Amino acid sequence: MTPSAGLGLKSQHYGDAIACDAEGLWFEVHPENYMSAGGPRLAALEAVRARRPVSLHGVGLSLAADTDPDPEHLQALKRLVDRFDPFVVSEHLAWSTHRGAHHPDLLPFPRTRAALDRICGNVARMQDALQRRVLIENPSLYLPLKGHALDEVDFLEALATRTGCGLLVDVNNVFVSAQNLGYAPETYLDALPAHAIGEIHLAGHAPDPGGSNLLIDTHGAPVAEVVWTLYARLIARIGPRPTLIERDDDIPDFAALMAERNRAVAVLASGQTAREPAHV
């Protein structure tokens, strides 16, 4: 597939998604929302997939947990992969399960050598179960953790090298983390291994409603201008990559999302001459 820009598929936009004839448009879904045996949601995704490529962006495998991924979850994900043939499957660099309990968030962890070994094992298990390469997304961070042995870019690069996985770069996450933890987002993005980047996410953020100086990765606002600037800088270095406009809260009409998507298409077109191709 020629890299272009897509949208997160929302139930209120099923009809628009099926009817839209925009060139190169694709849609991303959270597979956890489609793991039922049937029903109207799966039927709608079938109708969209008949016209458009789709990607599956998981939120529930808890790859940074201290246990193996849940085998039943992996089996359900494999059934969706077989059914919809997504052009990308991705997951988060985070944990959300511990001692049998599930936490409804994507939580951080100390980037130790032991954590790298454990997560490499879990990513390998995911790829083996799905029989395909997956992409792993960088997290959004809010407070410093003690115990880091590796910086985040080095951790991600080692993960990609050891497992053969690719990277999903969420530019908004990079900006939010950089603002909250006090580093330059440009330095982070410039250090990422271009060959490993298989997809990019763009989303909105907001100030902490509690009044702190933190930024929160809300997915509830348009992509900020500073994130667009960082995105253009990244594309100028690495060349075009499939790019998603993420919106999970305060969702506007389809036309407003398409306007953001079309802006991403223009940035991708400007990066066609970059020299570092993706290995997706």
From Swiss-Prot:
HAMAP family per the UniProt record, alphabetical: UPF0276 (MF_00697)
Pfam families (alphabetical): MbnB_TglH_ChrH (PF05114)
Domain of life: Bacteria
Reported consequences of knocking out the gene: Not essential even when cells grown in the presence of its inducers dichromate or cadmium.
Triggers of expression: Strongly induced by potassium chromate (K(2)Cr(2)O(7)) and cadmium chloride (CdCl(2)), but not by inducers of oxidative stress or thiol such as H(2)O(2), paraquat or diamide. Induction by Cr and Cd requires sigF. Probably part of the CCNA_03363 to CCNA_03366 operon.
Family: Belongs to the UPF0276 family.
Keywords in alphabetical order: Stress response
Protein name: UPF0276 protein CCNA_03364
